[in-house]
From Swiss-Prot:
Described function: Synthesizes selenophosphate from selenide and ATP.
Protein encoded by which gene: selD
Top-rank EC class of the record's enzyme: transferase
Subunit structure of this chain's protein: Homodimer.
Active site location: 16
Natural source organism: Clostridium botulinum (strain Alaska E43 / Type E3)
The keyword Acyltransferase is assigned to this record: no
Protein name: Selenide, water dikinase
HAMAP family: SelD (MF_00625)
C-alpha cells in the first residue's frame, strides 16, 4: 500500500470527462420503458439534473447521484470537488440538499489514510452545504472513484427545470469554462501549482451561493454545466424548451490558459464524445477559432449554473453574485425555435 501514488495516474479519464458519451447514453435510455407515476414530477425525459418526486402538496424531494474518478492528486481536494459536483444537481433544480450518502471505490494499492482524506474532503463540503452525511457504500476497485447520493427538498413551486426557457430571456453562466482542458494539462504536468489551485478552487466552489442569489427572482430555466460541456447542456435546455439558444462566444468566461492548451491539442477524450453527439445540433455563425469551439464543448467538472431569466432579473442576479465570484456573465439569449437548437455567434 502506498501514500505516494498519484491518484490521476490510476485513471484514464478524470472527473466528469469520464462520463459515458451523450450519444451512447441517449441510445440506451431511449430504449427503456418509462415508469408512470403521478407523483414523479421530473424524470429523465429531458435529461434534467435530478429527479423530483412529490411527497405532498407542500413538499417535493430532489434525488441525484454523482461520482467519478479523480481529476486531482490531492485526496482531500478530490473529495471536496466530487462532493461539490454531486450537490450541484440539487441546487440546479431549485432545492437545498439535506442528506447525502458516500459512494467510494478504492484500490488495494493505496494506503487507507487516502480514503480517509477523500471522505474528509466530502464531509467538509457537505457540511458547508448545510447537509449531513449518513452512511454510504464501498467497493474494492482498481480505479478510485468518489461521489455522493444526495437528497434535497423544496416546495413544488420552487422547482427549476432545464426545459422552460422563454423567448427574450438572457443566459447567464456562473463559472468559467476550460476545466476539463486544464485538468488534462495538469495530468500531463504542463501547469504549475498556482494554476492548479485556481482550477481546483473553481471546481470546489459550491453552486449554493449562485442558487441563493436567485432568491425572489424570476428564473425560467436552470441546469449545471458538467460533463457534456456548455454546448451539450445548452442543447438540453434549448431542446427541452423547444427554443434556440444563441451564445455570444466573446462573452463566455474562460480560465486563463485553456485556449492555449486547446490549441496545443491538450483536450480530454470526453470532448470528442460530446462533439460526436452534438455536431449536428449547433451551428457556428461567427469566425471563431477551433480552440474556442473546443472550449465550448469541453467537459466540465463541477461547473457553474446555466440560467435562463428575464434581462431585468439578470442584472439584479449579477449584482448579487459579484461578492462570490468574478466569473458570472451574460453569455447569450433565448430565441424562437430555429434550424438549430444552439447558435454560436
Amino acid at each position: 500500500m502506498s501514500k505516494n501514488i498519484k491518484l490521476t495516474s490510476l485513471t484514464k479519464n478524470s472527473g466528469c470527462a469520464a462520463k459515458i458519451g451523450p450519444g451512447v447514453l441517449h441510445s440506451v435510455l431511449s430504449s427503456l420503458p418509462k415508469f408512470e407515476d403521478e407523483n414523479l414530477i421530473v424524470g429523465f425525459d429531458t435529461s434534467d439534473d435530478a429527479c423530483v418526486y412529490k411527497i405532498n402538496d407542500d413538499t417535493v424531494v430532489i434525488k441525484t447521484v454523482d461520482f467519478f474518478p479523480p481529476m486531482v492528486d490531492d485526496p482531500y481536494t478530490f473529495g471536496q470537488v466530487a462532493a461539490a459536483n454531486a450537490l450541484s444537481d440539487v441546487y440546479a433544480m431549485g432545492g437545498n440538499p439535506s442528506i447525502a450518502m458516500n459512494l467510494i471505490c478504492f484500490p488495494s494499492c493505496l494506503d487507507i489514510s487516502i480514503m480517509r482524506e477523500i471522505l474528509a474532503g466530502g464531509y467538509d463540503k457537505v457540511k458547508e452545504a448545510g447537509a449531513v452525511i449518513a452512511g454510504g457504500h464501498t467497493i474494492a476497485d482498481p480505479t478510485p472513484k468518489y461521489g455522493l447520493c444526495v437528497s434535497g427538498f423544496a416546495r413544488p413551486e420552487e422547482i427549476l427545470s432545464n426545459s422552460n426557457a422563454k423567448i427574450g430571456d438572457v443566459i447567464i453562466l456562473t463559472k468559467p469554462l476550460g476545466i476539463g482542458i486544464m485538468n488534462t494539462a495538469a495530468k500531463a504536468e504542463l501547469i504549475g501549482e498556482n494554476k492548479i489551485k485556481e482550477v481546483t478552487s473553481i471546481m470546489s466552489t459550491l453552486n449554493k451561493y449562485a442558487k441563493e442569489c436567485t432568491s425572489g427572482l424570476e428564473i425560467h430555466s436552470c441546469t449545471d454545466v458538467t460533463g457534456f460541456g456548455l454546448i451539450g447542456h445548452g442543447y438540453e435546455m434549448a431542446s427541452g424548451s423547444k427554443k434556440t439558444i444563441e451564445i455570444f462566444s466573446e462573452y463566455v468566461p474562460i480560465i486563463d490558459g485553456a485556449l492555449d492548451y486547446a490549441k496545443m491539442g491538450i483536450i480530454p477524450e470526453g470532448m470528442y464524445n460530446n462533439l460526436d453527439y452534438l455536431k449536428d445540433k449547433f451551428v457556428v455563425e461567427a469566425n471563431i477559432s477551433q480552440e474556442l469551439q473546443d472550449v465550448l464543448i469541453d467537459p466540465q467538472t463541477s461547473g457553474g449554473l446555466l440560467l435562463s431569466l428575464p434581462e431585468k432579473h439578470a442584472k439584479e442576479f449579477l449584482s448579487r453574485i459579484e461578492k462570490f465570484t468574478p466569473y458570472a456573465k451574460i453569455i447569450g439569449q433565448v430565441l424562437d425555435k430555429g434550424d438549430k437548437p444552439i447558435v454560436i455567434k
